[in-house]
Structure formats: structure tokens, C-alpha cells
Amino acid sequence: MINEEKAIVDLLQSAEGPKVIAVVGLSDKPDRPSYRVAAFMQKMGYRIVPVTPKGETILGEPVFRSLAEIPFPVDVVDVFRAPEHVPAVLADVKQMQHRPTYLWLQEGVVHDEAAAEAEAYGLKVVMDRCLWKEHDRVHGRAHH
């Protein structure tokens, strides 16, 4: 089920849980929400995999042009794209060498049809939620 509390808690509290997050639409500008969220999650011990059409490295990690180019397993695909781009992102997810566990659509990113399709494909879907805010909530911290 979309936004299932157990899925969110399992992702963000698990000691051995997901550690690799592909961030689709990650900006190299420190003032952008995608950069701030990715930098925070990196600080919390997650490996960030930037997926964006330009740049060579972001947050010290090599940039991939598409999800399908990533040669190693990814636990979470975190989407910072406008809702109309979600079906194309999901199509890219389906081309990945290793199926991720989660499709996370950030705050303001809502696409019910693509979310339902992602669930049918076997992904756990979190929609219209901020990864950083949810991390803070699950760990009992006030979001800054």
C-alpha cells in the first residue's frame, strides 16, 4: 500500500536496511531541495547516487544519466521531478539491472497511476513525502 507507515519505518530505521539512494533530478546547487535532502541523507550514512542529465560528480559521487546505467544495486529511487515525469522515471526503473525496493516520490510529486503501476511491479511506494522530514520523524527529531 502506498505510504504504508511500516514501509517508511522499515526503510528509515533498519540497522541493516537500505543504504543506497538513487536521487533522480539531483541538483548540484546547494540551495535546491534535492541537494539539501541528498546531503542530509549522505550525512546520515546513506550512499547517494546522483541521476541527472548534466555534471560529472555531485556530493562527491559520480553522476549517472539514467537509472538504467547504474551497474550496482540501489535500495531507493528518490524522485525530485515534476509529477508529469514520473511515468518516464518508472520506465527507467524497469530498465535497471537490479530492481530497487522503494520508489519514493518527494513532497509535491503525486502521480497515482504511476504509483499503482510501481506497486504492481513489486515496489514499495512512498508518495508526496519528504525523505528528510520522514527520517527526522521516524527518529523522533524535529525537522530543521
Predicted feature descriptions by range:
Residues G122-H144:
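Active-site capping/gating segments
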Residues M96-A118:
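ADP-ribose/adenylate-binding Rossmann-like module
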Residues M1-K54, L59:
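Hydrophobic, well-ordered beta-alpha structural blocks that scaffold small-molecule cofactor pockets
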Residues V20, D75-V76, Y102:
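Structural motif
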Residues G55, E107-V110, R129-K133:
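Short, acidic/turn-prone active-site loops that include or flank metal/cofactor-
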Residues I58-E61, D75, E113-A116, E134-R141:
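Short, charged, surface-exposed secondary-structure boundary motifs
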Residues M1-A7, T57-F72, D78-L90:
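Glycine-rich, highly charged phosphate/nucleotide-binding loops
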